[in-house]
A protein has these predicted regions:
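Glycine/small-residue-rich loop that forms an oxyanion/phosphate-binding "nest" at active or ligand-binding sites
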Residues: 56, 64-113
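Loop/turn-to-beta-strand initiation segments
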Residues: 3-4, 73-78, 154
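Glycine-rich, flexible N-terminal cofactor/catalytic loop recognition
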Residues: 1-57
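Conserved helicase motor
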Residues: 54-61, 134-136
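A contiguous loop/helix-start segment that scaffolds small-molecule binding in enzyme catalytic cores
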Residues: 154, 158-224
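Class I SAM-dependent methyltransferase SAM-binding "motif I" and its flanking Rossmann-like core
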Residues: 94-151
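Short active-site oxyanion
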Residues: 25-31, 103-106, 154-155
Length: 224
């Protein structure tokens, strides 16, 4: 029986790729990629020419069985996403779950994920936190925010630049305008930026300065 490797890839800076990740990808019989075009750039940079197959949220229900069968037959499969660690607000959970159910060994390499550097650099308490990822866009959004109003741990969210100000404004309504927050964007890239302050202050900043790039919001928990 083969093995499934979950391989983190850089969230921005290609220098963040680990030696081990490169080796695993070069040795894999098959690489599952969220977007073969995006991953193709990374693989070309490191001269990795192994077979690659598309595996994303729109097709993973159909591809999982075939992948599991290939691993059972002895192949080594590596799973990557466009950026960061697969399964963290990215495709990956389904194939990992099916491998575990079928007694297949799963190894997740340590490596890049956007929320850890955003949390550590935020200046907010990081000994206890909860990761919420992307909030529901419509159904369930208010319910989710309501459930977090009494949360005392630091909270972490992912958001698109187009919805950032709207989401921060909603946070001010649910958590109070003076709640501390840190918004980190373009992590590890040339224009990386962290904007810290109260929700009121950070909303004002991004109202005047249109946000771009990938966004991580780190929100302080409710104080006693």
């Amino acid at each position: 029986m083969g093995k499934l490797y979950v391989v983190p890839t850089p969230v921005g800076n290609l220098e963040d790729m680990t030696f081990r990740a490169i080796r695993v990808l070069k040795e894999a019989d098959l690489i599952l990629a969220e977007d073969t075009r995006t991953s193709g750039i990374l693989l070309k940079h490191y001269e990795i020419k192994n077979a690659m197959q598309s595996h994303h949220k729109f097709n993973e229900h159909k591809t999982v069985e075939g992948v599991v069968n290939r691993i059972k037959a002895g192949e080594t499969v590596a799973l990557i996403s466009d950026a960061g660690t697969p399964g963290i607000s990215d495709p990956g959970f389904l194939v990992v779950r099916e491998c575990v159910r079928n007694g297949i060994e799963v190894q997740c390499l340590p490596g890049a994920t956007a929320f850890v550097p955003a949390l550590v650099a935020s200046g907010l308490p990081d000994e206890r936190f909860c990761f919420e990822g992307f909030l529901p866009q419509k159904k369930g959004r208010v319910t989710r925010l309501t459930s977090l109003q009494e949360e005392k741990r630091t909270m972490i969210f992912y958001e698109s630049p187009y919805r950032l100000v709207k989401t921060l404004t909603q946070f001010a309504e649910f958590f109070g305008a003076e709640r501390p927050v840190s918004v980190c964007r373009e992590i590890s890239k040339m224009h990386e930026e962290s904007v810290r302050g109260t929700l009121t202050e950070v909303i004002a900043h991004f109202t005047e300065n249109e946000p771009r790039g990938e966004i991580v919001i780190v929100l302080g928990g409710k104080e006693d």
